Amino acid sequence: MNIWHDIAPERITAKSFEAFIEIPKGCKAKYELDKDTGLLKLDRVLYTSTVYPANYGFIPRTFADDGDPLDVLVLCGESIYPQTLVHCYPIGVIKMIDGGSLDEKIIAIPFGDPTYHSYYDIQELPKHVFEEMMHFFEVYKSLEHKTTTVKEICHRDEAMDIINKCIDAYEGIFTSGKGKKRR
């Protein structure tokens, strides 16, 4: 089984989706999906003293501009174990430049999380939560002599547009009309 591909399409929509967690909140290890096997592999350990400020993973059945599944940060009161599916809704998106290329990261919240369930747009987040995420993405690769820049923060509607775009890209590349459409 490869979670990127082997999940029912109806479970992945712009308003409600399963996020696959690769990295728990508070971790310095950068795990990522091995696209061939569907397993997690250790990509690297972060060089800086920063840790992931939120649970980090991807949205299955999506294909982003960087050639990977669409990234997602899942804000939750708890660290979530890697390889866990989390039913989420989007509240915004961080658009960054990473290595000269656009890299979009959806910000999402699990349905029913008692800490974050009252937030529906990124602008509603407490200032510190928001600033901690921005700081992380501005410095997490600095000691590797790589540059990342937060370009723009967008609201829920833009996040849903990006998710739809990445679902459509996935369907165009991987299903070629053979699979069930999500709409």
Where are these regions (language model features)?
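Hydrophobic N-terminal alpha-helices or hydrophobic patches in metabolic proteins across all domains
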Residues: 1-183
